[in-house]
Amino acid sequence: MKLNDTIVALATPSGAGAIAIIRVSGPDALEIVAPLFKAKSKKDLAKQPTHTLHLGNVMDGERTIDEVLASVFRAPKSYTGEETVELSCHGSPYIQQEIIQLLIRKSCRSAEAGEFTLRAFLNAKMDLSQAEAVADLINSENAASHQMAMQQMRGGFSNEIQKLREELLNFASLIELELDFAEEDVEFANRDQFKDLVSKIQTVLKRLLDSFATGNVLKNGIPVAIVGEPNVGKSTLLNALLNEERAIVSEIAGTTRDTIEDEMSIGGVGFRFIDTAGIRETKDVVESIGIKKTFEKISQAQVVVYLVDSSQIAVNRERLQQVRIEIEKIKNKFPQKPLLIIANKTDRLADEEIHNLKTKLEEISSHAERAQFLLLSAKTNLGVEELKEKLLEYVNTGALRNSDTIVTNSRHYAALLKALEEINKVEEGLNADLSGDLLAIDIRQALHHFGEITGEITNDDLLGNIFANFCIGK
C-alpha cells in the first residue's frame, strides 16, 4: 500500500440512494478533481480555501456526468490530514462508478479498506484507539454502543491511558537518570512517591479491566436466553418483545426445535433474545438435540428468562413440582446467572388464581439464588413493559450514566492486562528494594503496552489487521 498517492472511494453505502459521496484524498486531490469540475461560479476549484462548498458539474471531456456539490478540505484541516475533496452526487450506482472510474483514469488509486482512517492515524489526526472507535461508531446499533464509541473517539480512553503513561514516564526518566550516575549512588526517583503512583496505576488499570465485561456485552448486545417447557409461549413472548413474528408459533408442544435469535434495543441498550427448545425429559432425538443446545445457550447468556404456563401450575401440583426441578437444574448448572421466572398466559386466570400463583412463585424464587418472578401475558402484552424494565435492572448501566471510560475492545483489554502484570512486577521490585536497572526493565515493558493501545508502539501487521475491518470509504 502506497501512502503518498491520491486515493478515491465511495464514502456512502453502495447501491442506489438519493445522494452518494465520493471521497478523494492525497497530495494531488485538488489538482486531479479541479480540471474535471466545472463550477457554476466559474471559479477554479484548485484555488478555493478549505471548508468551502461549490456547485458544479463533473465533466468527462465535453460530456456531463452529473451535477454535484464539491466540498474542499485543505491539509491539515481534513479528516485524513491531507488535501481532500468530497463530491456529493446523485445516488445512481451508474453515476457513482462513472465518476470513480474517471478519477482513477486521471491517476487516483482505489482506496483499500480503512485507508482514509489509516492516513488520519498516520497523520496524527487521531490515535489508534480513536481510529478503532470510528469502526465501532459505524457499527453501533443502539444508544449504549453509540455512546461508548463516541466517548472513545473523542479521546476519553486515550487521554486516561496517556495520562498514566506520562506519569510513569516521568518516573522512568528519573530511574534511567540514576543509572547514569550509578557510581555516585544517587537516588533521583523518590521511592515512596513512586509506590503511590504504582498503586494509583494499578487501581485505574483494574477499573478499566473490570469494565470490559460490561463493555463487551453492551457493545455486542446482552444475550438473554428464553427457556422453559415446550408450548408455554416462548415464541409468542419473543414476538411480543420484537413486535414482529420471527419464531414459529404453534399449539403443538415442542415446535421450537432449535434456537432462534433476534435483537432489539431497550432503553438504549441492545439485547439479543434467544428463544430455545424446552428442557423437559424426552426420547425424541431431534428435540433432545434442541435441549442440549438450550443449555449451551444458557451458558452464553447474561440473563436467563424461564417461562412457565401459569394456567397449568396454578391448578396442577405435579406440573408445579416439575417447574421446581427444571429451575433447580438451571441454577445448579449456572448458580450466578440472574434468573427471571415468568408466569405466562395470566389472561386465562381468575383473580384468586393469580393471588395463589404469586404465593407459589414467591416460594420458588426465594429458594433460587439471584431469582425473581413476574406475571405476564405475552398474548395481550400485559407485563411486557415490566419485563423490559427488569432486564435493564440486570445491566450495569451506571458506568454509562456517569460517562466513565468503558473498555470494549479485546485488543485494548489484552494490552491493559499485560501492562498490569508489568506494573505488579514494578510494585514487587519496589517492595524488595530492587535497584533502578532492574525496575527499569519492567517499567519499559509497561510503557510499551500503554503505547500499543494508542499506537505509539505498533507494526504493519497490527495496522493491517485493524484497518482491514473498516469499510472501503472510511
UniProtKB/Swiss-Prot annotation:
Q: Where does (6S)-5-formyl-5,6,7,8-tetrahydrofolate bind?
A: R23, E86, K125, K474
Q: Where is the protein found, in the record's own terms?
A: Cytoplasm
UniProt cofactor note: Binds 1 potassium ion per subunit.
Q: Which UniProt keywords apply?
A: Cytoplasm, GTP-binding, Hydrolase, Magnesium, Metal-binding, Nucleotide-binding, Potassium, tRNA processing
For the biological process aspect of GO, one term held by this record is:
tRNA wobble uridine modification
Entry binding sites for GTP: 231-236, 250-256, 275-278
**Principal subcellular localization:** cytoplasm
The enzyme's first-digit EC class, named in words, is hydrolase
Query: Which GO CC terms are listed, alphabetically?
Result: cytosol
Tell me, what's a Pfam family for it? TrmE_N
The cofactors it requires, by name, are: K(+)
Q: Which CDD domains match?
A: trmE, TrmE_N
Q: Which domain of life is it from?
A: Bacteria
Coiled-coil regions in this chain? none
Residues engaged in binding Mg(2+) = S235, T256
Disulfide connectivity for this sequence is none
A molecular-function term among this protein's GO annotations: GTP binding
Ranges for domain TrmE-type G: 221-396
Protein EC? 3.6.-.-
Indicate which residues the UniProt annotation says bind K(+): N231, S250, I252, T255
Give the similarity note. Belongs to the TRAFAC class TrmE-Era-EngA-EngB-Septin-like GTPase superfamily. TrmE GTPase family.
**What is the stated purpose of this protein?**
Exhibits a very high intrinsic GTPase hydrolysis rate. Involved in the addition of a carboxymethylaminomethyl (cmnm) group at the wobble position (U34) of certain tRNAs, forming tRNA-cmnm(5)s(2)U34.
Q: How does it assemble?
A: Homodimer. Heterotetramer of two MnmE and two MnmG subunits.
What is this protein's record name? tRNA modification GTPase MnmE
Species of origin = Christiangramia forsetii (strain DSM 17595 / CGMCC 1.15422 / KT0803) (Gramella forsetii)
Q: What gene name is given for the protein in this entry?
A: mnmE
